Amino acid sequence: MIFENRPLDQLKPGDHAELKRLVTADDLLVFAVATGNHNPMHLPDTDGDGDGKPDGTAPGIFLAAMISAVLGNLLPGPGTLYHKQSVEFLGHARAGDELLATVQVLEIAATGLVRLKTEVLLLPGRKVILTGEAQVKAPQKSIRFDDADLPGLIVERHRHFKALIARAKTLPPMTTAVVAPDDTPALQGAMEAFRQGIITPILIGNAAAIRKTAESCGEDLGNVEIIDSTHPAEDAVRMAREGKAQAIMKGRLHSDALLRPMMDRDTGLRTARRMSHVFVIDVPGRAHPLLVSDAAINIAPDLAAKADITQNAIDLARAIGLELPHVGVLSAVETVSPAIPSSLDAALLSKMAERGQITGGLVDGPLGMDNALDLAAARIKGIHGRVAGHADVLIVPDLDAGNMVAKLLTHLGHAEAAGVVLGATVPVMLTSRADSAMERLASAAVAVIYTDWARRQR
């Protein structure tokens, strides 16, 4: 937007300007971070005064800053400097309120100082919640300013994970075999999911080590079943086969050690579909979670494996609430090239979906990462399909590519990633020691939601 000021020689008493603003939860978070005022009374979804209700009251200075915005943008506008401001707070605003900030010129001094009446009103009733006077030094010459180059802000709130966790808490807790939870991250992750009512954990492994870990990190295991085992992965798989566990959660052991007994043809958890891992990634600024597969199990999948990988990812996307998932099959190029095998696989997967061999989603490829996610990039390259620029699910060429995509998003894109293994008789939470508490909790939530969805599809 271009702002144009009114220099001193164009001002007269009675001149008026106003600015509307809807107070959002993100506004309160940004203001708290920018000012260092972390008073919980001013944070959304936080009970700051202990009355059991969230507050989210806008700080008084936030209201005063709206006056500053009118002065700096509109009247007198760019080039204005504050000299003095008096304020009286007559009410409060909260996230979701619409406000109107107004200024009116009262007096213009020979020194170039301008006195203005300032108010902030709560709409629609126009209740005055701030009143006062400002004195500013008005600019001497005309100035036009284009704010197009100001950077945008994205608040890292991970609202999608919070929504998934809230949804999972409405479902019955899922009995989960937790394999080797004898370090703090693994044990605390399982216990937090237990406290939230998402899982009922059965801790399998070295019982003495598990109890020692619990003691060191202050976890009370009084109501939790512990199975002392020298082969916890095998025992967890056996419990799942026998129906004693509805899910498996990885603790402090290598993924290979857990996956090996799961994939045993005679005693494992195989189904007709190949097992694959799906990351559910909460990327700040996106309207919904982004799914990436496979980044953890299938190293160099062939076409048949990719078909199962794609179907597993579509099923999970539908389970978490995407009614018709848009699936972008990634390659380095957007055109089919015999020299690039991933482009051939992408084209074939698209055709398989078209012929009903993959169901439940829209599948298109090959697509580059840019034109799968960015509509403008897709249009520039002349790609006009329904998936291009709108992908909810990314199917990667191989494990290397998928792992890099997921880790770039989490470590550079400020995203958080939950993940589950599908294609087994029960979902498996393949957590990492580097996962945050939110990521571990979200993985459990996704597993519970998927299990409930799959049950209802039968």
Q: What are the residue ranges of the model-derived segments?
A:
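Anion-binding alpha/beta catalytic cores of soluble intermediary-metabolism enzymes, centered on
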Residues: 154-202, 207-387, 392-458
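Short beta-strand or tight-loop elements
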Residues: 83-85, 99-101, 276
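Short loop/turn motifs enriched for small/polar and acidic residues
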Residues: 90, 119-121, 330-332
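Short, conserved secondary-structure segments in the cores of folded domains
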Residues: 7, 53, 83, 88-89, ...
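HotDog/MaoC-like acyl-thioester-processing domains
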Residues: 2-13, 94-155
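A residue-level detector for short acidic-glycine micro-motifs
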Residues: 69, 89-91, 105-107, 122, ...
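Hot-dog-fold acyl-thioester-processing enzymes
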Residues: 1-80, 143
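Generic structural detector for well-ordered beta-strands
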Residues: 18-23, 88, 135-137
